[in-house]
Amino acid sequence: MLTQVPDAEPRLRCRRHAELLAAAILGVALARLLSTHAPIALAFACYGALHGAALALCLRPWPARWQAPAFVAAASIQSGLLARLGLLAAPLLARRGVEMAASLVVALCACAGALGYGALLRCLLRYRLAAGPLAMIALACVFAASAALVLMRQYPLGGTAWLAILWWLAFSGGLCADAGRRGLRAPAA
């Protein structure tokens, strides 16, 4: 019989995470088709909760009873607050042009979101993510969010879901790449 070691470092089950992320993406796409009008901060709070749940459910050993719900709630709050801050900051930066302001705000929020999310992973779920991989993930999230702005212009029906989905893919892809590198470095038992 297998027993859980209470202080064992959590491992991410990447295949399962990809499956849950795909289901969340389909759910978001369906929700966008059915209702395109939701306050941006609320939509992003929901996006944060969805990704947080998809991540917390894929850690082994399982997080303690309070850790996973606390992580999902914190991810939701962080995502909603960053969206709200972005909405407040955009008009202040719009003197240089709306498009430039939108690009800058989205890039800053994507980076801050990735760094904050990494801190939440470490603090609440005790998932070790070193500074180097986290910085690369944050950079990937900035590029993903910038690409999402282009998609939002080309395919407006997707709206803000483009930002969330591409950010999710960048962050989760980076996490899985880091988990794979860790697995290669781990000593064989």
Show where each model-derived region lies.
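Juxtamembrane/disordered regions of integral membrane proteins
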Residues: 2-189
